[in-house]
Amino acid sequence: MIDTTWVIILSFLLFAIGTFGLLSRRNLLFILLSLEIMLNGIILLFIAASNLHGNNDGQIMYLLVLTLAASEVAVGLALVVQIYKQQQNLDVDTLTKLRG
């Protein structure tokens, strides 16, 4: 079995990679993917902390964050598709306003 310390280190690495992608990328789709990587790091940390303390609260939080991530992806991808249809571009720097 993998030691809990390594799982916690992996979760922080995932969160750091997601943060780097969020801050360095300008494409809206890559920003959305970076947010998902960050959420996966948080989910992994909840499960590792739950295993470390011997209770199931982290697994319940896993289900809550997973549901939140799924709804975020659905809304985010719908917005990305609409922005691409209107602007033909997903660069955050060039998107100044959204017209209805």
From Swiss-Prot:
GO biological process: ATP synthesis coupled electron transport
Localisation per UniProt entry: Cell inner membrane
Coiled-coil ranges per UniProt: none
Any one annotated GO CC term: NADH dehydrogenase complex
GO molecular function annotation: NADH:ubiquinone reductase (non-electrogenic) activity; quinone binding
Domain of life per record: Bacteria
Keywords: Cell inner membrane, Cell membrane, Membrane, NAD, Quinone, Translocase, Transmembrane, Transmembrane helix, Transport, Ubiquinone
EC number: 7.1.1.-
Annotated TM spans: 4-24, 28-48, 60-80
Gene3D superfamilies: 1.10.287.3510
Topological category with respect to the lipid bilayer: Multi-pass membrane protein
Catalysed reactions, semicolon-separated: a quinone + NADH + 5 H(+)(in) = a quinol + NAD(+) + 4 H(+)(out)
Pfam family, one: Oxidored_q2
Function: NDH-1 shuttles electrons from NADH, via FMN and iron-sulfur (Fe-S) centers, to quinones in the respiratory chain. The immediate electron acceptor for the enzyme in this species is believed to be ubiquinone. Couples the redox reaction to proton translocation (for every two electrons transferred, four hydrogen ions are translocated across the cytoplasmic membrane), and thus conserves the redox energy in a proton gradient.
Assembly mode: NDH-1 is composed of 13 different subunits. Subunits NuoA, H, J, K, L, M, N constitute the membrane sector of the complex.
UniProt family annotation: Belongs to the complex I subunit 4L family.
HAMAP family: NDH1_NuoK
Protein name: NADH-quinone oxidoreductase subunit K
Organism per entry: Shewanella woodyi (strain ATCC 51908 / MS32)
Lineage, broadest ranks: Bacteria, Pseudomonadati, Pseudomonadota, Gammaproteobacteria, Alteromonadales
Gene this chain is encoded by: nuoK
